[in-house]
A protein has these predicted regions:
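Hydrophobic/aromatic beta-strand patches that form the interior of the parallel beta-sheet core
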Residues: 29-31, 60, 74, 99, ...
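Short beta-strand and adjoining strand-loop segment in the mid-core
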Residues: 137-154
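Residues at the C-termini of beta-strands that transition into short coil/loop
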Residues: 32-34, 63, 102, 125
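NAD(P)+-binding Rossmann beta1-loop-alpha1 motif at the extreme N-terminus of oxidoreductases
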Residues: 1-51, 67, 92
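Rossmann-like NAD(P)(H) cofactor-binding subdomain of soluble oxidoreductases
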Residues: 79-138
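Rossmann-like NAD(P)-binding element
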Residues: 51-93, 100
Length: 154
């Protein structure tokens, strides 16, 4: 089973964590500034009423507790927080795949500069969902899916 770390506790991070953990095919961890406000059981409800319920393996504000045991690190952050997050996780990234939901704000340039060659990189052109928090760290609404997604890999 692969382990995915979601960096970011906002609406997008909560929805992505809910959708991924719902499959039960991956273990999901969340790196957030406010771990005490998160529940281990989370859910997102889409605009058709489909419910994505999942259970998180771990929630922390300490990169050293989450990143080393993760196979994939996915930044679910606004562009202005990506560099700060990359610096936070850099000491613990060895050979993981590191990606960003928002990569059109310079993610690849920042990741090369900060991580060097220690990670495989990937990024989405745009966010895959429109998301809104219902209750922080517990539930969110997935208000719409993108019809098409583009992704870059290195």
């Amino acid at each position: 089973m692969k382990t995915i770390c979601i960096c970011g506790g906002g609406s997008l991070g909560l929805v992505v964590a809910s959708v991924l953990s719902h499959t039960r095919e991956v273990a999901v961890r969340v790196l957030t500034a406010h771990p005490q406000q998160w529940s281990k059981s989370i859910e997102a409800v889409d605009n058709t009423g489909k419910v994505y319920q999942g259970v998180l393996e771990k929630v922390s504000d300490r990169a050293e507790d989450i990143i080393p045991q993760s196979d994939i690190v996915l930044l679910c952050l606004p562009g202005f927080l990506i560099e700060q997050s990359l610096r936070q996780i850099a000491p613990y990234v060895t050979n993981q795949a590191v990606g960003s939901i928002v990569s059109s704000t310079g993610f690849f340039f920042q990741a090369h500069r900060i991580l060097g060659g220690s990670a495989s990189l990937f990024g989405f052109q745009r966010v895959p969902y429109i998301a809104r928090v219902r209750e922080y760290g517990h539930s969110a609404d997935l208000l719409g899916y993108k019809q098409q997604l583009y992704m870059a890999t290195e």
